[in-house]
Amino acid sequence: MDSRASGTASNGETKPVYPVMEKEEEEGTLERGHWNNKMEFVLSVAGEIIGLGNVWRFPYLCYKNGGGAFFIPYLVFLFTCGVPVFLLETALGQYTSQGGVTAWRKICPIFEGIGYASQMIVILLNVYYIIVLAWALFYLFSSFTIDLPWGGCHHEWNTEHCVEFQKTNGSLNGTSENATSPVIEFWERRVLKISDGIQHLGALRWELALCLLLAWVICYFCIWKGVKSTGKVVYFTATFPYLMLVVLLIRGVTLPGAAQGIQFYLYPNLTRLWDPQVWMDAGTQIFFSFAICLGCLTALGSYNKYHNNCYRDCLALCFLNSGTSFVAGFAIFSILGFMSQEQGVPISEVAESGPGLAFIAYPRAVVMLPFSPLWACCFFFMVVLLGLDSQFVCVESLVTALVDMYPRVFRKKNRREVLILGVSVVSFLVGLVMLTEGGMYVFQLFDYYAASGMCLLFVAIFESLCVAWVYGARRFYDNIEDMIGYRPWPLIKYCWLFLTPAVCTATFLFSLIKYTPLTYNKKYTYPWWGDALGWLLALSSMVCIPAWSLYRLGTLKGPFREPPPRSLQRIRQLMCPAEDLPQRNPAGPSAPATPRTSLLRLTELESHC
């Protein structure tokens, strides 16, 4: 295990000292590894946080919640929750050199459940997020043709209700009240072959299963050698989507009607700020798009060198992420404005979010463009890459957590590769359920409950409370100062102490109050047991935090049978950081290393150890 203490180098600079790992070396334990350079870390994090949510969720939320006015609550959550928690998790990983579970064990054992909660979310996320890649691959392969298969009603999967929009007047080639478009029929009858409910799963869609298998094979080989392979792959997977986004942006803004679409995207409606739902949407979008509370940032940060300037990296990555979301809105809504003008319908009828944008709205727009197969290939290749690096970083997060929990088992030759293979195979097999004819209903359950904003908010509350109030915000600032050479902006510390837990708690409670049962396509209502299954998925992660704390308290040997002073002292031991964490030398670089307790202020000594 990569344990570190501090010492003084010959040039007077305080450096972490790595103790000799005699037992592990005797047993042939491999080194944990580091990024070869800063760029690998930056691109890996960028690939993780800049994903599908930037393209198919943020622009729609802007349009839905008051256009430019939505940026007000978005920026509030960005600076009170997004940036502080982003820095907290990244710095925690860099400071402890541990994954998403053991990092929390080292700074506060009683809150180790935070790590288990985040990994439970990642386990569920790994199963269903990659399904989107399977769909995107299916569309990508279907785009290698002269005429796109969702462009007309003459295919075997089309029904008599299939009608096409006239490009000029928006009228339908028919008068049926049940009329559907070829894009929707391709999605529901060719790709999904969707059944009438979750109770009828039906047959497995073998074509999608092969696409899912291909996605998992690509994901496996992207991370099978750890940071050595991941650091190289992200040079392509994290940068090429930007090229595609720029190409689509240039094409979009040059289309007729683009200005109208961009106006709908940005025109501010300040009255929407009085709606609490707007603020909840802004908060959940921050947590979705910044990949916080998943353990991914902790895992990626743990491969940094000790003196890497994680504070500067975090600020740059946060603003890059938000900027990408903003620019993606221009690319998407310029296309939607073009659709609105060509079909002669309001933009509200073509604006969609989530899979509806990627697999219905945008494919419909592509059909109207010259050289439509080319633009379809560009778009779906971008979707695949946006989802791919987010997926394999999540798998890397889980694998890193397991390896750090059991280093003597997995940190040996070929053991890590076998572990990744096992995770991939199990996740693939479970994911096949979502590729049945009723699999879309299962997918929505996972998406709505398993990795919902509610779960992420719950974890964020305890993360900020643990670091700020139990471990000590000032002490964590001391740790960051020891790593980067200066103290971050003081506002971030006060966010950890007050703003982040308060804002997250308020948003969490509001999401409970405003909870509405899940529906599909605003028509199908899930049975009671479907909602119950969804809540079990949500609680599977949230329950880890209190359950672990109660377990640790319950396994203390006799604390409640001893006098109160001694029992409290034993409980405080569960709140004490590990002794082998890097130690800051407060006396100056020329002074000898000091015990860890000399770093604590009086109040921290009394409340911790």
From Swiss-Prot:
Cytoplasmic side of membrane: 1-40, 549-609
Protein localization: Cell membrane; Basolateral cell membrane
Chain positions found as Phosphothreonine: 594
Catalytic activity: 4-aminobutanoate(out) + chloride(out) + 2 Na(+)(out) = 4-aminobutanoate(in) + chloride(in) + 2 Na(+)(in); taurine(out) + chloride(out) + 2 Na(+)(out) = taurine(in) + chloride(in) + 2 Na(+)(in); beta-alanine(out) + chloride(out) + 2 Na(+)(out) = beta-alanine(in) + chloride(in) + 2 Na(+)(in); hypotaurine(out) + chloride(out) + 2 Na(+)(out) = hypotaurine(in) + chloride(in) + 2 Na(+)(in)
Glycosylation sites: 169, 173, 269
GO molecular function, one term: gamma-aminobutyric acid:sodium:chloride symporter activity
Origin: domain of life: Eukaryota
PROSITE patterns, alphabetized: NA_NEUROTRAN_SYMP_1, NA_NEUROTRAN_SYMP_2, NA_NEUROTRAN_SYMP_3
Membrane topology: Multi-pass membrane protein
Function: Mediates sodium- and chloride-dependent transport of gamma-aminobutyric acid (GABA). Can also mediate transport of beta-alanine, taurine and hypotaurine.
Protein name: Sodium- and chloride-dependent GABA transporter 2
Organism: Macaca fascicularis (Crab-eating macaque)
Gene name of the encoded protein: SLC6A13
